[in-house]
Amino acid sequence: QSDWFGVDLAADGSRSFSHDWTPTSATADYFIDDNWSAHFLRPAHGGEQFDVEAIYFDNDASNAYMAIVTSFNTPGGVFYLGDVIHPGDLAMDLGGGSRDYGIDVDGATGLVADTDAGDWYQSNAIFLAENGPTNFSGGTSIGNASLDIYDAGIVEGGYGTYVIEVSVPRWMLNDPGAGDIIGLEWTMGCRNDVINLDGSFDG
């Protein structure tokens, strides 16, 4: 199955993916972090089920496109040591602060909100590998992005693989122009693994 960025996911069911992570779009920005650790001080703590594999960004004249590949069960969350760990929301930095926009992933609504630091919180306060915000509540609602979350149907390290895809109209992000930088961050409520990307708008 190919995601929006033309990446064909394939795995042999063991430790790592057996495919090329490179997107087909020449303008796409992406970062790959396909690894995990059983040790608390190395991401992804807790093993493969908390691994965030990759993040992508691209745009056209009308929309910004983002995709995340993870072994973390999204949007259902992971039951871990007596607690349900929830997916985080997608945080965006467009020059107004480290989290000046957010997209609701945990509730699977795709709600886009203009946020500030006080709107963000950590959704799971126990079993955390790192302190820091993961989800938002409040802010100023702008509209809804197109959000598609699906099970890619492949197994890596004994756990499924999930793809989170977002398409958001550029006007919802205050019409960024060519060369403008967008910072992206996604994690889960315990921050056992965190992935970041600085992308740029092309045209």
List the predicted regions and their residue ranges:
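Acidic/polar low-complexity flexible segments
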Residues: Q1-L9, G96-G102, Y159, W171-G203
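Surface-exposed, glycine/proline- and aromatic-rich loop segments on solvent-exposed faces
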Residues: D3-T22, S37-N124
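Ser/Thr- (and often Asn-) enriched beta-sheet segments in non-cytosolic proteins
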Residues: G6-D8, S14-T22, Y56, F127, ...
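Short, solvent-exposed secondary-structure boundary motifs
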Residues: T27-F50, G132-T140
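Short alpha-helical segments and helix-capping/turn motifs at coil-helix boundaries
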Residues: F50-E53, V166-W171
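A general secondary-structure signal for short beta-strands and their flanking turns/coil
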Residues: A61-N63, I85-P87, Y159-V163, G179-I181
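Residue-level detector of buried hydrophobic side-chain packing
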Residues: M66, L90, I164-P169, L184
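Short helix-loop boundary/capping segments
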Residues: T109-T161
